[in-house]
Regions:
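Catalytic core of carbohydrate-active enzymes
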Residues: 1-163, 174-176, 181, 193-211, ...
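Non-cytosolic beta-sheet module surface loops
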Residues: 148-150, 286-289, 298
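Short beta-strand elements bearing conserved aromatic residues within extracellular beta-rich modules
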Residues: 157, 294-296
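Short strand-turn-strand beta-turns centered on an Asx-Gly dipeptide
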Residues: 159-167, 299-300
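Mature N-terminal, pre-catalytic/accessory segment of carbohydrate-active enzymes
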Residues: 248-260
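Pro/Thr/Ser/Gly-rich low-complexity, intrinsically disordered linker/stalk tracts
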Residues: 259-290
């Protein structure tokens, strides 16, 4: 797993796989969560339940707004999303003399959408293929927001519905982006240099108790992100693409993946008898200058 890069979801810091992270900062609110490089995460807006938004269920799931976050670095990624009504289930059992009862469970019809990314040579292309299928209550007319993780502002932003380029307008704040509703043939773009992932208590419909909690003041600042919102369209009719020129998503603190031929092996490996207990064996060795960690292979 060493060549694989993993990205801390909450900070954007990148790590190489195949290692143990010691002294990892994980306060009470933070579940250690790492995203594999080139992963794609489709989602809906934040909600409290899977039921549709109504006057009495204001914090339900609004399926008319889809959000797709891309964690591209270099290379390609792909993810197929399956969506259904979230409630249909049918079990038709059959009997087999040798086996017994056989369950045949169906969750009804569904819609599938393939999302993909390709980043190479300073250009990244993100694609939402035309959705396939249907289910009861499905509406393919949706707005789409692409979120691309980056480490610098891209040089160019090109958004397309099918083969038609959209008129992309840049806004100057996250609030302006969130409030924008692009018209047909339009898209809205915002580069957020230091996004704050903590939205708790900031919604217009938040309760007074939620607004008054001290956690609201906690900043969860992550790496820069590019936000592009497409106008509402029939997502089953054509693919949607976003191309970023001058794309880069690299962590300057990420150690180079190369072997140091001049690094010496530790000497004087020992297990002092006076430090051995019934449940542990303490190992000691000589310090190696330039070493950042030591790996031990234990046989037995």
């Amino acid at each position: 797993d060493n060549p694989t890069i993993w990205i801390d979801y909450f900070s954007g810091k990148q790590y190489r796989g195949g290692q143990v992270l010691n002294n990892y900062d994980a306060p009470l609110w933070k579940l250690p969560l790492f995203v594999k490089a080139n992963s794609i995460v489709p989602m809906y807006a934040e909600n409290n339940n899977p039921e549709a938004v109504t006057e009495t269920n204001t914090k339900g799931t609004d399926r008319s707004q889809r959000i797709v976050e891309f964690f591209a670095t270099e290379g390609e990624g792909s993810f197929t999303q399956y969506e259904d009504d979230g409630s249909s289930i049918e079990n038709k059992t059959t009997e087999d003399n040798a086996y017994g009862t056989i369950d045949n469970i169906s969750y009804g019809d569904h819609v599938s959408t393939v999302f993909s990314s390709k980043a190479t040579g300073g250009t990244a292309t993100f694609t939402a293929a035309a959705s396939q299928g249907s289910y009861s209550g499905y509406d393919s007319n949706r707005t789409t927001t692409f979120v691309a993780n980056v480490s610098a502002k891209p040089a160019s932003v090109i958004a397309k519905n099918g083969g038609t380029a959209l008129n992309v307008t840049e806004v100057d704040s996250q609030e302006a982006f969130d409030a924008a509703t692009p018209e047909a043939g339009q898209a809205v773009y915002f580069y957020n240099e230091s996004p704050n992932l903590n939205h708790y208590g900031s919604d217009a419909d938040s309760t007074e108790a939620e607004k008054g909690e001290s956690f609201n003041d906690t900043k969860i600042t992550t790496n820069p992100k590019v936000y592009v919102k497409f106008a509402k369209t029939d997502v089953a009719a054509a693919e949607q693409t976003l191309e970023l020129g001058g794309f880069v998503n690299a962590d300057a603190t990420l150690a180079a993946d190369r072997l140091n031929e001049n690094l010496s092996a530790p000497a004087n490996l020992a297990a002092p008898e006076d430090a051995t207990t019934p449940t542990s064996i303490k190992l000691t060795w000589g310090k190696v200058d330039g070493a950042t960690s030591y790996d031990l292979k234990v046989d037995g």
